[in-house]
Amino acid sequence: MMDGESPLRHPRISHVSNSGSDFGSSSDYNKYLVQIPPTPDNNPGPASLSIVLLEIDSNQESVPSVSGDIVSGSSGKDNEPDLTDVRINVGEEEEDDTLLSKISYSLTRVVKISPIIIALYRILIVVRVVSLALFLFWRIRNPNNKALWLWLLSVICELWFAFSWLLDQIPKLFPVNHATDIEALKATFETPNPDNPTGKSDLPGIDVFVSTADAEKEPPLVTANTILSILSVDYPVEKLSVYISDDGGSLVTFEAIAEAASFAKIWVPFCRKHKIEPRNPESYFGLKRDPYKDKVRHDFVRERRYVKRAYDEFKVRVNALPHSIRRRSDAFNSKEEIKALEKWKHWKVKVEEDQIKEPRPALVAPKATWMSDGTHWPGTWAVSGPHHSRGDHASVIQVLLDPPGDEPVEGKGGEGRALDLEGVDIRLPMLVYVSREKRPGYDHNKKAGAMNALVRASAIMSNGPFILNLDCDHYVYNSRAFRDGICFMMDHDGDRVSYVQFPQRFEGIDPSDRYANKNTVFFDINLRALDGIQGPMYVGTGCLFRRTALYGFNPPDVFVVEEEPSGSYCFPLIKKRSPATVASEPEYYTDEEDRFDIGLIRKQFGSSSMLVNSVKVAEFEGRPLATVHSSRLGRPPGSLTGSRKPLDFATVNEAVNVISCWYEDKTEWGFNVGWIYGSVTEDVVTGFRMHEKGWRSFYCVTEPDAFRGSAPINLTDRLHQVLRWATGSVEIFFSRNNAIFAGPKLKLLQRIAYLNVGIYPFTSIFILTYCFLPPLSLFSGHFVVETLTGSFLIYLLIITLSLCGLAVLEVKWSGISLEEWWRNEQFWLIGGTSAHLVAVLQGILKVIAGVEISFTLTSKSSTGGDDEDDEFADLYLFKWTALMIPPLTIIILNIVAILFAVCRTVFSANPQWSNLLGGTFFASWVLLHMYPFAKGLMGRGGKTPTVVYVWSGLIAICLSLLYITIKNSEIDGGSFMLV
């Protein structure tokens, strides 16, 4: 670096050896280079790229040294490769019978639910619809003339509840279960055959995205364990690439992932050798079952103890990173301050003696965060500085583990080694750390923007045709889950599958699941039912995407090829195709001309030629094999057994270019390409856009669970989580992503399901009103009906019994427990009177006044702490929030109303027992649903926080004053009361 130049203009690329032959326990990683964008002022243009190789640990394996400068110019047209340079040509040999050998395979199947259960389920739905219609008609025809206001409020609420129930229930008419055949997948893609004599894997590549944004709320140890579980999955190593998106640009996360890359050289071969499950070390070593069960190898006990000791040391290093980085930075900053002071003294002497004028040097050095090599961390500093804050920092790309070779690399064996890895493949998948550039004045679009940056960077570096995204706290629990997802993509008609959604499963939740954190009703009933229509919604994590679907292209049509068509069947720009009336032989693209409108593609994807050229390659590699059962175009067997192109500095430099903050300007990213912007629930909108184009999705339930994660189990965090989801739904309702405006390719029942997503928060208005009706009824002495007639009771009985019957049948075909169903019902009312109501208000404010809504990141749980012995200590953590005021008011009001009504009826000369019975039952129904909320207010061991007593007292005083005012008005002949 030349003197006087800004350090921001010299990017560096990270690099760590992926050899894995030695297993050092040092916390230092071998070598790394950090790459920063060449445009610190956000002005895209040519810049020089300085490559610096840093020697960190001489005991680790050496990496070939690369030094020098790479000059990366702007992507002008003169230097752009033509799109035809990456055209996939099968060649003249495609007519050969060997290449066109047709394979008949089925990788998935439908597991039918009992026809009797489904028939009864649909009959009960019809019965309940009819009974609701008759009941509402009867209610309208029989008003309560003594309390019309009470009758009118109740009827309006009941009409909305019936409408809301229909929106939720109708999409559940066609539930299905899908199963995969992993053995058939292996036989088709990884078994020697005439087209693949060596039996090398013909499976497509997968790019795995792991996202994190705050090292304080998302502990680096949790993220590191997630990375380790991904690196050790049962999928071809050379076909797997892992990207960690650190949107906070934290050095703690950076070094934690580097530590994980080093520990992976021990952990991954150990898992492969002994078939460890789960492959998250924290979860595996924390299992309460016998770890030696079914382990027959004589060396397992010894090697497990060695790996456990190595993991404990790894945990200590990772947990100590914040302190060690702070201590290191303080030491370097002290040296810099001494240098600055000496420079200032030298300047002062020079000015006094020579009487010359020179710029005064800075007396105080910046409080920088330092890397272990003695350079400034280019991301966010602990003490924010210019170009080093959370919203203003450079890009960083670090290749922690190199792309592996195609041939297995066996470890070393023999006595005296801690791990005998003879015959074990010790290769590791490629691992890349990415932190996109952020600058003031640019909208970074939160998680959606970070995901789109990963999509572009991964397209250039590995270009896997499929993308799996995981939150940092969701780890791989089933090492074969990736194969389960690929079964759907590679099956017949798999080319129309946009994504495969896995259910979210959670750990660390209290056995009773007090606040319905498992959300099993949504994951095992709603999403499973949508699987029988057009597919489940995308829920933000645990989802395997087809890259071309994420790019915004339409699904392929069924057609036959005419006149040497070119390009890809996925893209609407292809000409000369006609519908196929009968199933025809699969054909391959072999033309010599390209009919892509490059200008349009470039407008959508940006100026990067590498990115544009990668689109066709990803589409081709993501096709299922050509089979006799498919009328669509497939890829030839054995076409993905070749070697992957190694990474070079020019490629990584281009990856840095596409994650710059200015790259998305005047492109379709976030609007029609990638994750969609404009909502805090970008996941639902992104999946909706795919379904709107006609894509299909599948729901993949595996045994054991594919992924597991953590969920907030205390009441406050749970309410804030639900608030975020509900706010996103309100945003969807008031946007163009409302299902009402969707195109004709979205099926009717799927449209209703998406419409319900946008409407359900508005039910909170009617829930809140309905919860206040019992105390109003008890205080006034009237009920929602004038008298409890037989017709009313019969209708009520039929509606209640039909609901219970539907619940039992849903439990039968979904596999959830009745307790989980009931917990969901309880939290539906708790959330409806708190978070959903606030979400509606926030959404309306955003639409009318343009008030932006911001949310804090939900804290992820970590190991250790003051209550280390109590697994559910967080459950009793009480943090007051204004969201608790409406439910607390409802509880107090209903309890007071019951006591008041009982006393009044008992001491009344003309007691109205029917009204008391109806009102008390009504209020008890509300209180029964509020029980988990009330229990949460009690804290641990029934110790109610003081703030609850304060608010209860205030509410009681307000109610007393209101009652006195009403009584005085009634005595004076006023008309204050509505009764």
UniProtKB/Swiss-Prot annotation:
It comes from Arabidopsis thaliana (Mouse-ear cress). GO terms for cellular component: Golgi membrane. This is Putative cellulose synthase-like protein D6. Its EC number is 2.4.1.-. Residues 14-24 have a biased composition (Low complexity). GO terms for biological process: cell wall organization; cellulose biosynthetic process. Gene3D superfamilies: Spore Coat Polysaccharide Biosynthesis Protein SpsA, Chain A. Its main location: Golgi. The active site is at D247, D683. It holds the Pfam family Cellulose_synt. Keywords: Cell wall biogenesis/degradation, Glycosyltransferase, Golgi apparatus, Membrane, Transferase, Transmembrane, Transmembrane helix.
